[in-house]
Amino acid sequence: MTEKKEFQVNKNTPFWDASLTDQERIDWLLKEMTVEEKLGYLASSSPDLPRLGIPGVSVGGEAAHGVEGRNDQNGLGKPDVTTSFPQPIGMSASWDPELIRQAGEVTGTEARVVWHRHEGHGLSRWAPTVDLERDPRWGRNEEGYGEDPVLTGKMAGAYIRGMQGDDPKYLRCAATLKHFYGNNTEVGRGWKNSSIDPRNKYELYLEPFRRCIEDGGAEGIMTAYNKINGTIGILNPEVTDILKKQYGLRHVVSDGGAMGLVVTLHHYFGQHAETIATALKAGVDAMSDDPRMVEQAAREAYELGILKEEDMDRSIRCMMETKLRLGVYDRENLNPYDRVTEDDIDSPKAREICKELSRESIVLLKNENGALPLDKALKAEDIAIVGPLGDAWYQDWYGGTAPYRTTFLQGMEVLKQENITFADGLDRVVFRCDGKGLAVAEDGTLQMADEPDVFIKEYWGEGSYTFKSVRTGKYLGARLSESQGEKPKMGQIAADREEAFDWFVMEIFHVEPQEDGSVVLTNRFHYPVYRDAEGFFSFEQTEGTPITMEVVENGIEKAVAAVRDKKQVLLALGCNSVINAKEEIDRNTLELPEEQEMLLDRIAEVNPNTVLVLFTNYPYTLQKAMEKLPAIIMSATGSQDMGSAMAEAVLGTYAPAV
């Protein structure tokens, strides 16, 4: 946990007196604060006020489908285990607002527990995302609730009501809608303009925000990076004119780093002082940016006379209203939602709600001749599961650390109480260079060796590969730390991580065939793999080193052999949640990865009793599957019960549609 500078909290002031109205308490605070102190209170991370004995409380933290408490970016230490529900697009597919409300209640309660662990963090969460799914290629489709504003408003509104609770005075936690508005593409979102005509604006783009504020009671919203009809999201006066005055919204924050981007990407203003002055006047109350930069920009704006103390007071008031409703500044602990214990995380009730919502989020896309559910007479030995998603569970960026992760194979084997034949359909390959093999050394680095290591080649489409060592179970990728290995080097290639995961997924490779049959491997930034004179491999901005990639086991043929004599085949295909589609990355195609299509073709050809089990957070074109297979069933990822819920649906022990 980050250390907070110790000072004496002083609760013997009107600010801490819950018998006063919130406005009276804030009036006292604003009267007592100096201009200098107010300049430091315009960022989402607010500092302590030692002179007044008031500790700082930050807003922020993710909760798309449960509390995100990985703590891999905020310096708070080891991950907080929290309940992980299906992705929002999956929750919405349940069409069950009461069940989603219960999931929101779990999220809000667990946020309270995490708050007590890391006091000052995580009670105002940046969720849900209510941007409409306007393009199936959008990289963040998983975070939204669908393409319909009514559905989005109802389902996201239910999640909000659960998160915040129904007490007339206090909040369980605060929900913050994302992103106001027209945020429907990732590539270029920091500078692009969304041109929206009046009818689409009011009937589609604004409607989910209106419903989630007026009906769901959302406490805040986050502005978008993009321009809307030429106006940058953080500078948009509609924040006040529509959200606050018409819909009754309480507070507004900027997206992360948005204040700085007005100068560096939009090139709209020449200095941050102009940005913060205009943003505060537009109605944005807190800048989610470097607090020191925010404070300095505010100081310069104040000294220039373009930012008034009344502008700061208005924004501080809006943010303080939410903080008081959270109960964090009460002299006595009066918030009924604060009576939580460690037992409220991953509780039996939370598990029950997650399992039920995971079941209900499953969608049956095709079912001819009663192919599903499977015949109850089928034994485990009659079934084969094949495909890269059959025994996989992939972490997504806005998901937390789940208490457990259930894959489809695991779920099926638990219900059948026996092992089931499984083949992932992925090739096993070895790499060679200058007559020697490539292997993972004891320190994890990729080095020359007499005997090459075998790697599982995972192909995710759009040229993106990952390679996992069969021997160590870890993925090849680029080290970003200079403190590892015998020859520390930025960008050195090593097999260090058990999953391909990060903001920039450094385990992604692209394979560029050469005329002589060799390949050059490059990373996502197209830096090639280079071998230096000492035999170490790294990504460099230079000519790549040719490498031979040899298939030593054909994954598709192994899968074909596994299914040939089975009575039933379950073909598990789909996506990795952080490859090819996530924040800052849009898809370029709606097709399944080519190798998954090839696997589908071969399996359908060999065994017509094949059901496609699809684990995905975004749409695919499934023409081949619709033509060749009798049944298709789909689930979003993200749930700790993903695999077991799907197994129940496939075997008929639970019927999602009933």
Task: Describe each PLM feature range.
Residues 1-658:
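Glycoside hydrolase catalytic-domain context in secreted enzymes
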